[in-house]
Amino acid sequence: MRKSFFGLCLALAVSASGAEIKIAFSDFTASQSPTNFHNALAGTGQPGDWKIVTDESPSAFTPLMPGTAPAARAVRRPVLAQLSQDPADEHFPMFIYDGQVFKDFKLTVPFKIVSGAAEQMAGVVFRFQNASNFYVLRASALGRKVRFYKVVNGIRSDPIGPALDIATNTWHTLAVQCLGNQITCWLDDKPLTATMNDSSFSAGKIGFWTKSDAVSYFGDTTIAFTPIIPPAQALVDSIMKKYPRILGLRIYLPDADGRLRVSASKNKSEIGMAGTDAESNSLTNGAVYYGHGKGTVDVDMPLTDRNGNPIAAVRVQLKSYMLGETRDMVLTRVRIIINEMQKQVLSKTDLME
C-alpha cells in the first residue's frame, strides 16, 4: 500500500517474514527537499545541499523484447541530489532517513556520480548512530574503487573493498545487507567482498553519503527489513504464548516527558494510551489494584527490578471463572503471571529499546 509518512512518499509492504519500505523520490517534484530526513555532516564545512532534481532514472531503462539488451527511453524522473561543492578533503555530507531504525535489513540504492573536481563519490551510511558513529559503503569514480569502513567516535577504520571502474553519469546500484553482526555488500548485483563480521553497531538509521565537492544522485531506495520488536513487547508476546487465555496484558512505562503510557500490549493498538492513577500508583508506590467487570477481572501490579524496586506497571485482564472467586484467588492467579515476567526482567533496561 502507498501512504504519506510525515510528508515522505513511500511504499510499505509487510509479510509474515518481514517488511519492505520504498523511499520514492520519484513521487516528489523538482527543487523540493524531502521531509523525514535530516542533514548530517562528518568532518568540516557546511552540511550538504540535498534536493530533488529530475534525471533519466534507472527505472527508465526497459528491454525492447525478451532476451534483448535494455534500451534507454527519454524519460526523466525526480531523484535525490547532493548539490553542494565544498572542495574540503574532510567534508562528508550525509542525508539521514528518520522514519525508522533498522537492525537486520537489505538496503538497495541506485546512484549516479555526476561531477566533482576534488572527489567523485557516492555512498550510503547504515546503522547510523550520529555523525561520529556509523558504517559506510561508498563508490569512487576518481579513485576507481568501492570501499566499506566504519566510523567509531569519529575515527575511521581501515577501508575494505576492491578496485573497480565506476563510470560517471551512469546509474549503478549499491546494496548492503546486515544480519546480526554479518555485513555483505554488492555493486551492480556483484558481491564486493566476503561477508564481514563487525559488532560495533547492532542497529541504527540509514542515509545517503558523499564527499567533498562530489555531486551525486540517488534513485528510489528499497529497504527490506525485519521489524525490531521492543523488549517490553517481546516480553508481552512471550507471556501470551505461555498463557494464551489471558484476555489482556499491558506494560506501562514513562515516556520521554515522564508521562505513563502503554509501552507494550497484547492489543498493539493500545500502545501509547495514557495510564491511569492506578498504574501510576503501582509504579510509584508498588500498589496493587483490583477491579471486575462482566465476566472479567482486572489487576494492576508493579514489575520490579532485582532489588524489588518498581520499574513498570502491569495490567492483567483475566476471565472470572466462578461467582465465588475471591480477590485473593484472583491475585494469586495474576502473581503467577507477574512472577513469570519477573524471570525475564532484572532491571528497567530489560524493558527499553
Language-model features: locations:
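Extracellular glycan-recognition surfaces and repeat-rich motifs
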Residues: 32-79, 90-91
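Secretory/extracellular carbohydrate-interaction modules
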Residues: 74-153, 211
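Juxtadomain coupling helices with adjacent low-complexity linkers
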Residues: 229-233, 319-353
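A short beta-strand signature within small-molecule sensing/ligand-binding domains used
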Residues: 294-303
